[in-house]
C-alpha cells in the first residue's frame, strides 16, 4: 500500500525504464504528472510517454495531471509534488530519469510508516552518491543533506514549504540560515540562489525543500547501498554537469 508520483515530459525511452520497475513494485496508487508541450515538436514524445504509463497490468488507483500549457521544469516539479501530497499523506517521488531498484519501494514503505509522526525526519532518499557507504552496519543512516534523485516524504513536510520565499524578508530567519550554512559547510551561494529564484517568480522546489529542512532541523534517511540509477547524467541534462562514468549504480 504505497503511493508513487512519476514526473515526465517527452522522453519515452527513459520513462520506460523507470516504469518497468514501478510495474514490478505494483503500488496501490499512481500519480502521473506531465508538463505541457512547448510546441508541436513535443507532441510525439508526449504521446509516446502517455502510452508507456498506460500499460498498467495490476489493480491500481490512478490519478492524472496532464498540463495543456508548458510550465517548464520549474515550477512544474513543485506543482506536481504539492498536487500528489494533497491527495496522499505519504508518497514516493520519481522523475523520468530516476530508475529505482525494486527494493526501493519496500524500503520507502517501511520507513514512511515507521517515521510518519517523527517530525525530525523530512525525507527518505534513494540515491547514495558513495554507492556503498563503508563502516555502517545498518541498512540506512541519517544525514542533514539529501538527494532528489528518487525520494519519499510526507504531507506534513510539504505543508511547510514556503512557495514565496518569505523567509528572505525575516532578519532573524536569515541570521539563523547564514549560521547553519556556515556550520554545516553548505553551499555558500544558497541564499543567493533563493533570491534569484524568487526574482524569477517561480517556485523552485529544490531550494524551497532545502530551506524548509534547514529551518526545521530536518534529517534525511539515506540507504547504505544506493538504490537509484540516475539516467539524467547525459549531455542534454537540465541539472547535471558531471560524468555518467562516475555515477554509482542502483542495487
Predicted regions and their residues:
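An acidic/histidine-cluster motif and surrounding catalytic segment
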Residues: 1-93, 98-251
Amino acid at each position: 500500500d504505497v503511493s508513487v508520483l512519476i514526473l515526465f515530459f517527452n522522453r519515452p525511452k527513459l520513462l520506460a525504464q523507470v516504469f518497468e520497475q514501478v510495474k514490478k513494485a505494483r503500488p496501490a496508487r499512481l500519480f502521473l504528472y506531465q508538463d505541457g508541450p512547448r510546441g508541436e515538436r513535443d507532441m510525439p514524445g508526449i504521446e509516446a510517454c502517455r502510452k508507456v504509463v498506460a500499460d498498467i497490468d495490476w489493480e491500481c488507483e490512478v490519478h492524472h495531471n496532464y498540463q495543456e500549457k508548458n510550465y517548464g521544469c520549474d515550477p512544474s516539479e513543485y506543482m506536481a509534488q504539492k498536487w500528489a501530497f494533497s491527495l496522499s499523506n505519504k508518497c514516493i517521488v520519481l522523475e523520468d530519469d530516476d530508475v529505482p531498484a525494486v527494493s526501493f519501494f519496500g524500503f520507502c514503505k517501511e520507513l514512511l510508516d515507521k517515521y510518519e509522526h517523527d517530525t525530525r525526519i523530512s525525507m527518505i532518499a534513494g540515491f547514495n552518491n558513495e554507492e556503498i557507504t563503508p563502516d555502517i552496519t545498518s541498512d540506512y543512516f541519517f544525514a542533514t543533506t539529501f538527494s532528489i534523485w528518487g525520494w519519499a516524504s510526507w504531507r506534513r513536510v510539504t505543508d511547510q514549504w514556503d512557495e514565496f520565499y518569505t523567509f528572505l524578508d525575516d532578519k532573524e530567519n536569515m541570521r539563523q540560515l547564514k549560521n547553519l550554512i556556515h556550520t554545516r559547510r553548505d553551499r555558500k551561494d544558497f541564499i543567493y540562489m533563493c533570491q534569484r529564484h524568487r526574482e524569477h517568480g517561480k517556485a523552485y522546489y529544490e531550494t524551497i525543500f532545502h530551506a524548509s529542512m534547514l529551518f526545521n532541523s530536518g534529517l534525511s534517511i539515506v540507504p547504505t547501498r544506493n538504490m537509484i540509477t540516475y539516467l539524467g547524467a547525459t549531455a542534454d541534462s537540465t541539472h547535471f554537469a558531471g560524468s555518467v562514468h562516475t555515477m554509482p549504480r542502483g542495487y
